[in-house]
């Protein structure tokens, strides 16, 4: 199986079109536009502030807290050491990369590797990470904002962490996985967390971490646990939030979905027909207030979808006001995260400005 470490090693090679994954595919086979956008970004001669809502980071101190556990497999069959190494915060290196990619501001997040850890240790890790994120944002407020980490396996603790992160540390919401140890976010145990996010008027950034039950099916060449599994995990998470009535219960809850929301935007119309096709599979006690596809207006979708055509399709499905810029930095999925947006002939300059930063600025309550 291709590991993330092996995949990451291809980043520089991929930029020049070298074969990766042993698949015989080339980065150039689905080439990004040749124009490379760098700071400052101008649209119609006007300076535009770009805000990247999908930017990973890690702190070495979290590994210290983990101790020997850092070598154990914690996320999607990968250890903390393997996942974290490429994302350790090196400010000068990160700022230089942001300048090259045309990113004014990153909204930093840490993919949750602690859901399977006992409450006290997980709480220590989350506390440390939120403190470090707040320090980094305070040091470079014009370049960094952040989503808090939450001990979501202990919802009562997560509520306290979110309150502290937003009200005292200035963080802009929270980053969560696609499931918590196999439990869907629609489970009532998580309702207090969603209620707190709604009260604080901050978004939750859903980023998948891997579905253990699919690991065997997706093993082998091609990094399928991520390439296919991650979008699927997001699709499942969002679908449960819709069909179990969570969005009805929390109508002001704001969710940002990584990787363009997985497969949901393309299959939302199929969801609209699901209960018509199989009425017995739908709970008569859960009466949704809207058709399933209408809930896409409560979800924001990042732009980590690679091509101008994919952007056109996403905007057509969910509306331009629901799409925000993402890069997946430092992982080399999309080496030039602005190019496919600029190359999209279907987008007006005003729409591009929205996607690049204006929508995120409103969502996160700061000025673009």
For each feature predicted by the language model, list its residue ranges.
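Mid-to-C-terminal alpha-helical segments outside catalytic/metal-binding sites
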Residues: 2-28, 33-49, 53, 59-105, ...
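Catalytic pocket-lining loop regions of alpha/beta-barrel enzymes
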Residues: 33-41, 137, 166-324
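Active-site loop-helix segments enriched in His/Asp/Glu that coordinate
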Residues: 113-138, 156-166, 184-195
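Divalent metal-dependent hydrolysis catalytic cores, especially in the metallo-beta-lactamase
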Residues: 77-87, 93-118, 143-151, 172-176
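Short aromatic-enriched loop/helix-cap "lid" or pocket-rim segments at secondary-structure transitions
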Residues: 62-66, 121, 216-219, 267-271, ...
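Residue-level preference for long, well-ordered alpha-helices that form the structural scaffold
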Residues: 83, 87, 122-129, 154, ...
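Alpha-helical scaffold segments that form or flank carboxylate-/histidine-based iron centers
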Residues: 51, 150-153, 157, 256
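Short glycine-enriched loops at secondary-structure junctions
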Residues: 152, 208-214, 329-331
């Amino acid at each position: 199986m291709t590991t993330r470490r092996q995949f990451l090693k291809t980043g520089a090679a991929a930029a020049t079109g070298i074969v990766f994954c042993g698949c015989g595919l080339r980065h150039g086979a689905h080439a990004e536009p040749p124009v490379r956008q760098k700071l400052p970004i101008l649209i119609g001669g006007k300076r535009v502030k770009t805000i990247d809502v999908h930017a990973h980071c890690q702190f070495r101190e979290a590994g210290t807290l983990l101790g020997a556990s850092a070598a154990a497999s914690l996320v999607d069959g990968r250890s903390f050491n393997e996942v974290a190494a490429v994302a350790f915060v090196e400010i000068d290196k990160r700022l230089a990369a942001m300048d090259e990619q045309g990113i004014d501001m990153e909204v930093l997040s840490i993919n949750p590797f602690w859901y399977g850890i006992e409450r006290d240790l997980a709480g220590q890790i989350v506390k440390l990470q939120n403190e470090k994120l707040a320090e980094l944002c305070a040091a470079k407020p014009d370049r960094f904002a952040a989503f808090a980490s939450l001990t979501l396996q202990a919802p009562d603790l997560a509520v306290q962490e979110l309150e502290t992160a937003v009200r005292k540390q200035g963080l802009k919401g929270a980053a969560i996985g696609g499931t918590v140890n196999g439990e869907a976010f629609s489970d009532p145990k998580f309702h207090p967390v969603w209620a707190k996010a709604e009260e604080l008027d901050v978004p939750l950034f859903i980023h998948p971490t891997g579905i253990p039950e699919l690991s065997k099916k997706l093993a082998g060449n091609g990094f399928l646990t991520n390439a296919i599994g991650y979008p699927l995990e997001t699709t499942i998470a969002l679908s449960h939030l819709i069909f179990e009535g969570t969005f009805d219960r929390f109508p002001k809850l704001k969710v940002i979905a990584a990787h363009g929301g997985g497969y949901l935007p393309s299959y939302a119309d199929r969801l609209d027909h699901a209960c018509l096709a199989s009425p017995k599979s739908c709970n008569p006690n859960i009466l949704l207030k809207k058709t399933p596809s209408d809930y896409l207006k409560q979800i924001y979708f990042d732009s980590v979808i690679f091509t101008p055509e994919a952007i056109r399709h996403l905007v057509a499905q969910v509306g331009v006001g629901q799409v925000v810029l993402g890069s997946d930095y430092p992982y080399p999925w999309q080496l030039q995260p602005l190019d496919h947006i600029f190359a999209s002939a279907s987008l007006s300059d005003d729409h591009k400005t929205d996607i690049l930063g204006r929508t995120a600025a409103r969502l996160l309550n700061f000025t673009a």
